[in-house]
Each structure stands twice: as C-alpha cells, then as structure tokens.
Amino acid sequence: LMDMLEAGQIDLMPNISYSEERAQKLLFSSNPEGTERYYIYARPDRDDLAKGDPQALQGLTIGYNPGVMQTFVGQQWLTNEGIACTYREYDGDSVLFDALANNEVDAVIMNDTISSPSASPMFYIGSSDYYFAVPKSRPDLMNDINAAMTAIARVNPRYNDEVKSHYSTQNSGSSSLNGPERS
C-alpha cells in the first residue's frame, strides 16, 4: 500500500509513522493524528515476565512484524536493556498473536491498538506519533486535511484521543489471574 500511496494511486492513508525517508516521498499532516504506544506482550500466565524485570526476556524468542515502527522501537529497547533474544518475523498482527497463543514465540512486539485475549502487555517500550499521509502530488489535499484537523482541534482538543479510544481495540489484556492473584 505504501508503494501505491507514493505513486499517487492512493490519495490518503491514515496512521503512518513519520520518518525522514518517507518525508522525501510523502506529505504528512502538520499535526499528529494520534500517538501509538508500543509494548512487549506475552501470554497472561507468564508470571516470570509479569514481575517487570526486562532481564527475564534474556534468551526468549520474540515475534515481530517487519518494516513497522514498533519493531524498530522494540528491538532498540531490547538492545538498550542488554537483552539477547531470538527474533522471529511474522506478516500480520493476527498471525503474530496466533504464534504467541500457539507457543511458537515467548513474546511479541506490538502497538496498543491491537488486542488478543491470549496476550497481556508486559513491558512498555516506547511510542511515536502517527499522521495522515498523501502523495507529494497532492498538496491541495494535505492543505484541506490540515485545515480540517485545526478546525476540529479548536472545537475539541481531545478529539484524537476520543477517536482512538472509541475505534481501536483497547487491550483489555486477559481475564486470567496471574500468580499472586491466584494465591
């Protein structure tokens, strides 16, 4: 889809993370559409990870989606924490959570807009803003988007948060009890 957007075959895409490389090919809205938070998720019964010690991730297999901001941020966080782990690539969010549920991986790197009953966020690893993006050939459309976003923000400064809360799958985690709660 990104190739189609860059080529002008798609006029508008929401939820695009900004990068210098992308800014050479696309126009981004002046203000963010929202903020995405990134986590390392694991099965709810992983009491060893629920204690909050990143070193518990040492040697584990961690699933990720290729070419997305959360993977870059997550792998950088793991490196900064001194974690040596094995990475396994999966195409698609549902495939990634299925791999976690089926014990193919010990944990996954994912954003906060996707949820699964077989996954609980264990470690907050970072965040980034996301934007509306249009092809460079459509500055007229970007001007309209920026004007609309400004008008909305003037009326309701929390509009973006409300939309995200209403339409994204908020991770309610699992209804499973962890070790201390079971005691």
Indicate residue ranges for each PLM-predicted region.
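Extracytoplasmic small-molecule ligand-binding "clamshell" domains
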Residues: 1-20, 24, 64, 80-82, ...
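Ligand-binding cleft/hinge of the Venus flytrap
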Residues: 29-31, 56-58, 67-89
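Sec-exported extracytoplasmic/periplasmic mature domains
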Residues: 6, 10, 62, 75, ...
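N-terminal globular core domains of eukaryotic regulatory proteins
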Residues: 2, 87-89, 98-104, 124-126, ...
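Extended ligand-binding regions for polar small-molecule ligands
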Residues: 44-70, 126-174
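Extracytoplasmic/secreted envelope proteins and their assembly/folding machinery
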Residues: 2, 6, 10, 37, ...
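Alpha-helical transmembrane signal-anchor helices
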Residues: 174-183
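Acidic, polar ligand-binding/catalytic clefts
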Residues: 1-56, 110-127, 136
